[in-house]
Amino acid sequence: VILMAGVVYISFQKSDRDSYILTFSDKLLQTEFSGVRAVKVYASDTRHAWLEQACVNVVPSTDGKTRLFSPESEYLKISQDADTLVICLDLTNYDLPEQKKKYLIPGLQAKGLQLTIEADANLAFLTNTIRGLRTNINGIKTDSLATHIQSGEVRLDSCEIRALYVDGDGVTFNAHQSIIPYLYLDLDGVRNWGVHECTIGTEHLTGSETYHRNELQKGECKKMIWTPKKEDAVLHVTMKEKGCLVLQDE
């Protein structure tokens, strides 16, 4: 089901630095889906593009249905593949002037891409591989959720998730006022993380390299478990409050 929420537009303009700007409208389309357990957000082109004022918001559905609110655009391809909602930013047909096509990597800036997903409690996996597209997860209550993020921030706010998995490439993870009994962070992909007014039971960390500058924040978790992927992997943790360190074999 697709409902028009208003008149929409896309505008292009050239900047002073010979780059081109694609501006998405804030007028939205509403699309309804059923049986969604996973969301995949990605870009299909390989051109040098960067995003500004762009994010994907995941919020709870009030009636058990999954809905997507997105700008109307020829560059957004939206579909459902089995239980996966697929959102593709496809800029391969972006029309450049003939002289610009001679450059190996034309510059393109995409502004104002705002996606909102109303998800039910069955959502279990979210992947966002568009660089610069921030991920916000607000008010979600579910048993488990796995996220894979490409070079961007994922922010969790006012959520209750029994088991949360975070990995990807160059991820910044921040949790605010959330309850997470089991938090799993893959440090090969999670660049840094912060916990703010949260209740976390066990924090599971894994990785294959040497990780410095990991400061255990006050009240961050009740227990931390380090599981290296390689024998020479090293985790450095700074503790600033009273605690107990227990070493044990597998």
Name each region found by the language model.
Residues 1-149, 154-157, 167, 176, ...:
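Intrinsically disordered, low-complexity terminal regions
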